[in-house]
Amino acid sequence: PTVHPVWLGGLLFAAYLTRPTTAVFIVLTFVYLLWRKRREAGLTAVTAVGLLLLFVIYTRTTMGLWLPPYYLPQRLAGSGAPVPIVLYGLLFSPGRGLFTFSPMFLLVLLLAAWKWRALRQEPFYGLALAWIGLHTATLLRFEHWWGGHSFGPRLLTDIVPAFMLLTIVFARQWPAGLRPSRQRWLMGLGVLSVMFSVYVNSYAGLYQVATAVWNITPDIDRAPQYLFNWRYPQFTATTATNCAKVTE
């Protein structure tokens, strides 16, 4: 079963209303619809654009602006840091790196690249990769690409569904031709990466107060260099390590 175009348009607008960075996904969704389901694209677009116009009218009436500041492109002014540094920070840094906090996503990406010849025929394969790449590229232009006071890669949570799509697509093409020993090794690596990711994003993120205090010892918005300091990864923060940061 497929989602009715009216519902889909409403959901896409709701996604944008919640997080304006989902505009990347919305554009890709319309490209997919025009490619695969052209008959549904029109009604989906009319619904989404209609709701967007109502939002614009409401904002103009109540705030005197076409869109709230949170939605304006001025946020894409850039941080002034070199692009490779920001990319490393987004993906591998000890303070905000997506693959540092959730290595299972790195494994999924590597497996998807490994089987690209078999997976490239899957429409969701290209959609997921484009979503991940374009969203990450958008964040490279953010002034505060690390997402302010938060835990881990907050601004990259939008692309978690893209990694889920890749996982599903890869699972359908599970490499049955591999020797059993290699299949066991691959599954073991997957289990370990999932366990580490769950630990970091549940126990460390939810129940360790020190990981929240890490943002203010010192203020990470004023001392973003600590995003890259492997002596003080956020997910291993303790009262002692936070105090050590302050006294450096």
Where do the PLM segments sit?
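Membrane-interface alpha helices of multi-pass inner-membrane proteins
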Residues: 4-19, 26-33, 49-53, 90
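Hydrophobic/aromatic-rich transmembrane helices and adjacent perimembrane loops
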Residues: 18, 101-107, 149-172
